[in-house]
């Protein structure tokens, strides 16, 4: 017969086909302007990148390397730093939205999304968060935008309100299973409220950004300080176990009568998005938080280095969450036996996550103020 020569399927293609969308956790004007292997367009063509996430730390780093922003900043002299940051970041995000709009259309709005964060100083203010999210939504003015709202207690009702208004939300800084469940329900509340308002659910999407590596970064040192021989075996297990158990919550809610009713009315599932997936510990494979968290209806947003680490991974790519719930539970049972409190760790991580973004925002203001 005829010999067909099929190209080998790349690792990134396999990950994508298994249901995990690959997004780039980075954005800068140079990625939008240049036409080399670091550009956003190049990564969409060669590395299966189908979305972009940003945060205050990312913009702070981008603006420190300011050569590509000189003209933009010069044009904003006389404006205050907050206004300048808003204008510069929304311009970058709008350009990124335009560059990946074709992916948005090809995937019926599931991918091809770019996320921009509300000012982290508003993390504990529900109304101020809603107001700024509306402003960002109308200023960027692109259907393929996500507004990032932190999963604080104040953030939850803000998420419900924004979804009700038809604004697509990326819920960020989720560390605990309990809070993740509340996020899913806040999303369903928003969809239900919108249906009760007599509006349709067309075009409304959401992702829930569940943070991964920071859990190991917090728990591993506690294990290293332990004398119990079991402690060593638990290194590098908590973060993946936590994310896998989050997926179990996602599956449970996705099978609920309430969700099936909303889905029947056109609601889109809120996908779990694995964030903070760069490996901080040299003892681990640099793609650990990618290859161990592959499952349908998920997103993994990665720094560029992690995308390349995943690309060069030679092991098997398969649904790596299925069948792991019992062993994941066991990880936390053992941690508890060693006196490591899950609740204490995740509560501290949320507080720390907000203050990190807060500090990055202050750094951003300082960087811009110096140039205005």
Residue ranges and their predicted role:
Residues 54, 58-158:
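Active-site beta->alpha loop and helix N-cap motifs at the rims of alpha/beta catalytic domains
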Residues 48-49, 141, 158-169:
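Glycine-enriched alpha-helix->loop->beta-strand junction motifs that scaffold or abut catalytic
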């Amino acid at each position: 017969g005829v010999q067909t020569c099929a190209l080998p399927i790349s690792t990134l293609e396999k990950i994508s086909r298994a249901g995990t969308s690959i997004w780039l956790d980075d954005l800068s004007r140079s990625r939008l302007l240049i036409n080399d292997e670091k550009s956003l367009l190049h990564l969409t063509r060669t590395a299966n990148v189908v979305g972009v996430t940003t945060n205050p730390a990312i913009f702070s780093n981008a603006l420190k390397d300011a050569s590509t922003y000189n003209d933009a900043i010069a044009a904003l002299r006389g404006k205050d730093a907050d206004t300048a940051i808003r204008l510069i970041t929304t311009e970058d995000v709008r350009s990124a939205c335009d560059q990946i709009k074709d992916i948005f259309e090809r995937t019926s709005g599931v991918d091809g999304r770019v996320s921009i964060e509300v000012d982290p100083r508003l993390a504990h203010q529900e109304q101020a968060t809603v107001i700024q999210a509306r402003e960002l939504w109308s200023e960027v003015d692109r259907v393929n935008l996500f507004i990032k709202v932190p999963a604080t207690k104040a953030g939850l009702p803000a998420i419900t309100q924004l979804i009700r208004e038809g604004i697509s939300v990326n819920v960020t800084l989720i560390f605990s299973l309990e809070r993740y469940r509340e996020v899913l329900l806040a999303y369903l509340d928003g969809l239900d409220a919108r249906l009760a308002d007599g509006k349709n659910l067309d075009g409304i999407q959401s992702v829930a950004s569940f943070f991964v590596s920071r859990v190991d970064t917090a728990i591993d040192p506690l294990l290293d300080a332990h004398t119990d021989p079991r402690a060593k075996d638990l290194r590098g297990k908590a973060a993946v176990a936590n994310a896998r158990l989050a997926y179990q919550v996602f599956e449970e809610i996705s099978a609920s009568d309430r969700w099936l009713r909303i889905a029947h009315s056109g609601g889109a599932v809120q996908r779990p998005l694995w964030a903070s997936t760069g490996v901080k510990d040299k003892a681990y494979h640099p793609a650990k938080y990618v290859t161990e968290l592959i499952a349908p209806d998920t997103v993994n947003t990665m720094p560029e280095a992690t995308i390349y680490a995943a690309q060069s991974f030679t092991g098997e790519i398969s649904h790596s969450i299925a069948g792991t719930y019992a062993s994941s539970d066991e990880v936390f049972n053992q941690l508890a036996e060693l006196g490591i409190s899950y609740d204490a760790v995740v509560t501290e991580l949320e507080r720390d996550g907000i203050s990190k973004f807060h500090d990055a925002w202050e750094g951003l203001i300082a960087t811009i103020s110096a140039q205005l």
